[in-house]
């Protein structure tokens, strides 16, 4: 079972929040847990975004302090990217997700330059970011703050089915 590996920079109250949120995440992605590994989490005081995932080091930076609801959403969002980068089977879901979101099938899944530098309104158009925000809604039941990302009921069904290794809608 994959684990979160917590850096010494992570305070005790944040550790508790991370562990509880990880349990929620694994409850949804349990059927896929064998295709992604551990992830390291480092707490930082300054970061342009709330959180950032680096697939080359399998490390997530999280800006603290922050409200618990925002931290939970940021954790789940970046863990969704972790699954996306580590789980080869993730590609099985992409066309169904693009269809569910009403996007052309030839839409690039990710921005070639990454997405952290993009304006918020452009960031929300990237399928990979729509997927990650949809995962937030699936795992946490909703999104605790507004983003420009459009989530569809069909997208929620696709992500949920894929996470549980059920037939895609």
Enumerate the predicted regions with their spans.
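Post-signal peptide N-terminal regions of Sec-secreted extracellular proteins
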Residues: 2, 55-56, 66-69, 155-158, ...
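Auxiliary, metal-adjacent structural segments of Zn-dependent hydrolase domains
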Residues: 2-58
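Structured segments of extracytoplasmic/periplasmic soluble domains
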Residues: 24, 28, 32, 78, ...
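Active-site scaffold of zinc-dependent metalloenzymes
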Residues: 38-73, 79-86
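Acidic, glycine-rich loop-and-strand cores that form catalytic or ligand-binding grooves
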Residues: 76-105
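Metalloprotease/metallohydrolase-associated module, dominated by Zn2+-dependent proteases
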Residues: 99-169
